[in-house]
Amino acid sequence: MLTTMKQMLLSLAGLFAAAALFAQNSFVHEQSDGYVWPEDPAVLEKLDQWQDLKFGVLMHWGLYSVPGIVESWNICNEDWITRPEGSTYEGYKQWYWGLSKVFNPVHFNPEQWADVFADAGMKYMIFTTKHHDGFCMFDTQYTDFSVAKAGPFADNPKKDIAKYVFDAFRPKGFMIGAYFSKPDWHCEWFWNPYYATPRRGINYSVEQHPDWWKNYVDFTKNQLTELTGGRYGRLDILWLDGGWITGDQVGLNEVLPEARKVSPGLISVDRTIQGPNENYQTPEQSVPKTQLKHPWESCMTLGTDWGWTPNPQFKTARRVIGTLAEITAKGGCLALGVGPTPDGVIEDKAIVILQEIGAWLRRCGEAIYNTRITDHYNDGRLWFNAAKDGKTLYAVYALPDGENLPAELTWTGNLPKGKVTVLNNGKKVKAVVKDGQVTVKLPKGLANEPIALKFSL
């Protein structure tokens, strides 16, 4: 049995490494068409604080991490899903559920995670308490399909993983976010075993089985209440995935008022469900084409997938910094997806890139954090932000991979008053303005990296 499991894992690792990019692009959440501003003053205040942070981490971790495959989606029987040749759908699904008996992150070290991401300059975190597969990364009372009950880690004193993750990040000053999937494919009241499961939604008629749906709504409300009721401390963000089910269908409107008694100003992110419970938008693996004037976040992966995969192809630090500059200039935040390994740590290859990002932010972060949009926000590879007082502007030159810094930077509009400070090394340089065009000659000796400038208007 163990040999068979190992063979299956090796086979899957190779297959899904090749398929990861295809799967990633086959289904991503687009942003909602519109935005509804919340009316609660505490939520508005929390959103303003969150918009100061700019850079966060979104951690996917669960059963899918064991073989290193696309998170949850492989048990969804849709046309774009890739599984090993010859495997039956039901056989594969049972194999996947069986990973709950294998998942054993003996090196689980949330303090290491918090150190790594704080050093990377990240200011908020979102952790997957439950993905679509239904496997709970917290000690829920409402199902045994959880890390705290189903497998070998159930005997570990840190079996209530979400609690230990949240508790490790709070002392570092992070805003704390709980990811929760509204669909639960393991729950019999969502995918009932009496019927086949051909698609991601419920597999029965609610009109014919209203009691089943009521059971599911109660189950979901109970789990959300567990997470937000105080047992896991004060939360800042409730990040709800699975936009084919709306929050109000599963009782979110009843949960939030009680949750906000424990966590005043709790930001609700009912993804892609335009309305009062989507307090910020979340375009996935993309950046909006233009500036937006309401709260939003691009959630994007460091590698090719959300969870850990073997031999990942990571984005460079330079690329992440350039994307972060574009996002902040357009008014958003970046939640960067980094998945812990099956045994519970952040892998070294990811740490190297994150350290490089953090080193840049320690020198140039003034051009990112606590900024707001300005009317003229882009000129070629230059992205502009403004300080909150509107009197100081920042420009970040997004240096592409494989290219060297130019000797000078030029742009139109946003005319500096006085000298320009190069945040990378703190030196002041002259800005030459002629016919509405600004030219800044860069000082010698700069590292070959994105450049951040600061100047007054």
Predicted regions span which residues?
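Mature catalytic domains of secreted/periplasmic carbohydrate-active enzymes
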Residues: Q24-L457
